[in-house]
Protein backbone atom coordinates (compact mmCIF):
# COMPACT_ATOMS: atom_id res chain seq x y z
CA UNK A 1 0.00 0.00 0.00
CA UNK A 2 1.35 3.42 -0.99
CA UNK A 3 2.08 6.06 1.61
CA UNK A 4 -0.61 8.75 1.81
CA UNK A 5 -0.83 12.32 3.08
CA UNK A 6 -3.85 14.25 4.33
CA UNK A 7 -4.30 17.69 2.79
CA UNK A 8 -6.72 20.20 4.36
CA UNK A 9 -7.70 23.55 2.85
CA UNK A 10 -7.27 26.28 5.49
CA UNK A 11 -7.82 29.47 3.47
CA UNK A 12 -10.26 30.62 0.79
CA UNK A 13 -9.41 30.46 -2.90
CA UNK A 14 -11.29 33.71 -3.62
CA UNK A 15 -9.01 36.29 -5.20
CA UNK A 16 -6.16 33.83 -5.79
CA UNK A 17 -4.33 33.22 -9.03
CA UNK A 18 -6.33 31.05 -11.46
CA UNK A 19 -3.43 28.57 -11.55
CA UNK A 20 -3.61 28.17 -7.76
CA UNK A 21 -7.40 27.68 -7.86
CA UNK A 22 -6.92 24.97 -10.50
CA UNK A 23 -4.29 23.30 -8.33
CA UNK A 24 -6.71 23.14 -5.38
CA UNK A 25 -9.34 21.54 -7.62
CA UNK A 26 -6.71 19.13 -8.92
CA UNK A 27 -6.04 18.06 -5.35
CA UNK A 28 -9.79 17.61 -4.86
CA UNK A 29 -10.23 20.48 -2.39
CA UNK A 30 -13.48 22.43 -2.69
CA UNK A 31 -13.92 24.51 0.47
CA UNK A 32 -12.25 25.64 3.69
CA UNK A 33 -11.93 22.75 6.13
CA UNK A 34 -12.22 20.10 3.39
CA UNK A 35 -9.73 17.24 3.84
CA UNK A 36 -8.62 14.71 1.24
CA UNK A 37 -6.16 11.81 1.30
CA UNK A 38 -3.71 11.62 -1.59
CA UNK A 39 -0.80 9.33 -2.45
CA UNK A 40 2.56 10.79 -1.47
CA UNK A 41 4.04 11.20 -4.95
CA UNK A 42 6.36 13.90 -6.33
CA UNK A 43 3.49 15.27 -8.45
CA UNK A 44 1.18 15.66 -5.46
CA UNK A 45 4.00 17.15 -3.36
CA UNK A 46 4.61 19.73 -6.09
CA UNK A 47 0.93 20.70 -6.11
CA UNK A 48 0.93 21.01 -2.32
CA UNK A 49 4.08 23.17 -2.40
CA UNK A 50 2.46 25.53 -4.92
CA UNK A 51 -0.52 26.23 -2.64
CA UNK A 52 1.23 25.66 0.69
CA UNK A 53 -0.05 29.01 2.01
CA UNK A 54 -3.66 27.73 1.69
CA UNK A 55 -3.34 24.14 2.90
CA UNK A 56 -2.20 22.09 5.88
CA UNK A 57 -0.47 18.73 5.35
CA UNK A 58 -0.43 15.75 7.72
CA UNK A 59 1.87 12.80 7.09
From Swiss-Prot:
GO terms for molecular function: structural constituent of ribosome. GO terms for biological process: translation. The keyword Ribosomal protein applies. The keyword Ribonucleoprotein applies. GO terms for cellular component: cytosolic large ribosomal subunit. It holds the Pfam family Ribosomal_L30. Keywords: Ribonucleoprotein, Ribosomal protein. CDD domains: Ribosomal_L30 (cd01658). Part of the 50S ribosomal subunit. Belongs to the universal ribosomal protein uL30 family. HAMAP family: Ribosomal_uL30_B (MF_01371_B). This is Large ribosomal subunit protein uL30.
